[in-house]
C-alpha cells in the first residue's frame, strides 16, 4: 500500500492553512506586535548608581551644622527628612508604611538605591520594625525609622524598651489621629505615650526643624554620657506633605559614622555572641528583680536625659525660642505646627492692640523647666494651644511654672 509523501500543511489556531512561512511575529505582554528591537550597544559602560554617594566626604558636626554653606530649597517635610538622612551617614533603615509616614520611608528607599543608606528593608509590621531596630542598634550601627499614629502604638512595646537598653536609635513620628473617629489629620496624642519612657523627644514646627532635628538628633543621642534614643515628632500633613523653605548643606558631605565603642554600654558582638543572652545577673533571679534595682537603672536613664541638655543647647541653640515675651500682655506656649498657627493669632492680636508673646518649645524631653520659669515670671496670662484631647503640653507647662 502506497503512502502519501506530501509535506505536512501547517495551520493556524482556526484550522486555516498557513500559505507563507514568514518569520513569527513577536508581541509584547499586551499582545501588540513588536515592530523593532533595539540592538544592544557594544562597549557601553554601566553607570554606578552609588557613584555620588561614594564621593561624600565626612565632616565634623560643628562644620555641618554651623559652617557649611547652605542653599534654600522649597520641599515637603518627607523630602526634608530624606535629605537629612542623606547627610547623616545612616547604616540601616527599616520601613513599614503608614500614612502620613509612607512617603518618607519610600524616599529613604531611594537613598538606599543611590548608596547613601547602607542597608534597607521592609519589616512585617511596626512591632517587628522597632524590635529589629533595637537589635541593630545594640549591634552598633546607626539606625533610622519612622512611623505614625496607630503604628506608634503598635510598635510601642519595643520602642519604650530602647531607653532602658541605652540604644541611640532615631525614630521620626509623623503624628496623626489614633482613635475613633479615625482620621489622618494631625493629632499628636501619641506623643503622650512617649513622654515618660526615657527617650529624648523633639517636636518640630516645620520642614526646616525636621531637617535639622534629625541630623542633630543622631549626634546628641550618640554622646557617651547620653547614649539614648531620640524621637523627632512632627504633625502629619502640615509638615510631611506641605512644602516649606529649607536651608540645606550640599549633598557631598556627611556626618561622621557612629563610634559604638564610645557608648555608655557595650555593643553586642554579633560575630561572637554569648551562649546565653539572658543570663541571671547577680541582681535578679530569672525575670524577678527587686524594684529598687529597676528604679536605680531608670534613674540613670533620666539622668542621661538631663545630661543631653548641654548638647541640645550646643547644637540646637536651646530647648526653646522666645519672641516678644518682654512686656507682653499674654504668652502663647506651643510646640509643633501649633507654633505656626500661634504666630498668626499673635498677628491678629497685634492688629487689635494686644501684645502677645510666643514661646516655642523644641525639646519635650528634657523639658525646659528653668527656661519657662524665667520667661513666664511676669506673665499675666498663659495660653497653651495643642492638637490633642489630653493636653499633655499644658500639663507639663503648669507643672513647670
Model-derived features: positions:
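Structural beta-sheet core signal
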Residues: 145, 171, 231-232, 332, ...
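Short helix/loop capping segments that flank catalytic or ligand/cofactor-binding pockets
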Residues: 155, 181, 241-243, 341-343
Amino acid at each position: 500500500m502506497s503512502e502519501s509523501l506530501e509535506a505536512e500543511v501547517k495551520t493556524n489556531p482556526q484550522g486555516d492553512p498557513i500559505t507563507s512561512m514568514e518569520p513569527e511575529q513577536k508581541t509584547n505582554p499586551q499582545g501588540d506586535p513588536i515592530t523593532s528591537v533595539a540592538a544592544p550597544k557594544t562597549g557601553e559602560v554601566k553607570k554606578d548608581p552609588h557613584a555620588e554617594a561614594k564621593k561624600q566626604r565626612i565632616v565634623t558636626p560643628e562644620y555641618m551644622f554651623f559652617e557649611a554653606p547652605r542653599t534654600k530649597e522649597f520641599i515637603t517635610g518627607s523630602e526634608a527628612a530624606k535629605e537629612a538622612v542623606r547627610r547623616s551617614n545612616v547604616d540601616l533603615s527599616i520601613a513599614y508604611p503608614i500614612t502620613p509616614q509612607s512617603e518618607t520611608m519610600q524616599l529613604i528607599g531611594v537613598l538606599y538605591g543611590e548608596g547613601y543608606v547602607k542597608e534597607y528593608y521592609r519589616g512585617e509590621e511596626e512591632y517587628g520594625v522597632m524590635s529589629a531596630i533595637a537589635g541593630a542598634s545594640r549591634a552598633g550601627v546607626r539606625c533610622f525609622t519612622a512611623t505614625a499614629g496607630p503604628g506608634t502604638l503598635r510598635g510601642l512595646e519595643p520602642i519604650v524598651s530602647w531607653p532602658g537598653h541605652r540604644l541611640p536609635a532615631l525614630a521620626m513620628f509623623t503624628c496623626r489621629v489614633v482613635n475613633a473617629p479615625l482620621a489622618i489629620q494631625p493629632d499628636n496624642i501619641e506623643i503622650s505615650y512617649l513622654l515618660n519612657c526615657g527617650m529624648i523627644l523633639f517636636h518640630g514646627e516645620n520642614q526646616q526643624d525636621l531637617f535639622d532635628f534629625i541630623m542633630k538628633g543622631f549626634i546628641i543621642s550618640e554622646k557617651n554620657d547620653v547614649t539614648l534614643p531620640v524621637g523627632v515628632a512632627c504633625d502629619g500633613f502640615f509638615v510631611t506633605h506641605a512644602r516649606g523653605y529649607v536651608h540645606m548643606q550640599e549633598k557631598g558631605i556627611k556626618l561622621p559614622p557612629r563610634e559604638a565603642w564610645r557608648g555608655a554600654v557595650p555593643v553586642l558582638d554579633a560575630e561572637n555572641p554569648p551562649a546565653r543572652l539572658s543570663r541571671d545577673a547577680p541582681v535578679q533571679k530569672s525575670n524577678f528583680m527587686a524594684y529598687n534595682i529597676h528604679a536605680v537603672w531608670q534613674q540613670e536613664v533620666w539622668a542621661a536625659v538631663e545630661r543631653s541638655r548641654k548638647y541640645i543647647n550646643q547644637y540646637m541653640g536651646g530647648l526653646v525660642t522666645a519672641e516678644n515675651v518682654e512686656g507682653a500682655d499674654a504668652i502663647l506656649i506651643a510646640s509643633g505646627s501649633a507654633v505656626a498657627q500661634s504666630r498668626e493669632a499673635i498677628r491678629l492680636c497685634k492688629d487689635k492692640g494686644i501684645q502677645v508673646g510666643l514661646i516655642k518649645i523644641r525639646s519635650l524631653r528634657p523639658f525646659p523647666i528653668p527656661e519657662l520659669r524665667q520667661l513666664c515670671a511676669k506673665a499675666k496670662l498663659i495660653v497653651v494651644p495643642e492638637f490633642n484631647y489630653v493636653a499633655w503640653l499644658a500639663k507639663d507647662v503648669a507643672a513647670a511654672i
